């Protein structure tokens, strides 16, 4: 649970990094972050949502993992690849 809790803080900060350049992705991730935190609190205070909260928490967590990794690719990898492709096309001309 410690790993989940640590990643929940990282996932919660993801919209802050995306806000200036990719607002649609940032806004799309906010509902999943809210659901993830509600389900985590339901897990801490056991019995809130019975057995449904286990599978829903894992689903919300995995969606947030996907969004955070997609955001990292968009923010860091795509600009790097784009600059390399520009240099490659300029060198072949």
UniProtKB/Swiss-Prot annotation:
Mainly resides where?
A: membrane
Q: Which family does it belong to?
A: Belongs to the YwcE family.
A cellular component term from Gene Ontology for this protein is: outer endospore membrane
Q: Which Pfam families does this one have?
A: YwcE
Which keywords does this Swiss-Prot/TrEMBL entry list?
Cell membrane, Germination, Membrane, Transmembrane, Transmembrane helix
Membrane-spanning intervals of the chain: 1-21, 25-45, 57-77
Membrane topology, as annotated, equals: Multi-pass membrane protein
Gene name, Swiss-Prot/TrEMBL: ywcE
Q: Does the keyword Transmembrane apply?
A: yes
Native source organism of the sequence: Shouchella clausii (strain KSM-K16) (Alkalihalobacillus clausii)
UniProt function note: Required for proper spore morphogenesis. Important for spore germination.
The answer on whether this UniProt entry bears the keyword Transmembrane helix reads yes
Protein name listed in UniProt: Spore morphogenesis and germination protein YwcE
């Amino acid at each position: 649970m410690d790993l989940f809790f640590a990643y929940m803080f990282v996932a919660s900060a993801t919209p802050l990094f995306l806000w200036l350049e990719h607002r649609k992705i940032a806004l799309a991730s906010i509902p999943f972050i809210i659901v993830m935190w509600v389900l985590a609190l339901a897990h801490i205070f056991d019995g809130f949502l019975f057995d449904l909260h286990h599978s829903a928490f894992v689903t919300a967590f995995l969606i947030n993992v996907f969004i955070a990794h997609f955001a990292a690719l968009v923010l860091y990898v795509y600009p790097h690849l784009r600059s390399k492709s520009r240099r490659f096309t300029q060198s072949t001309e």
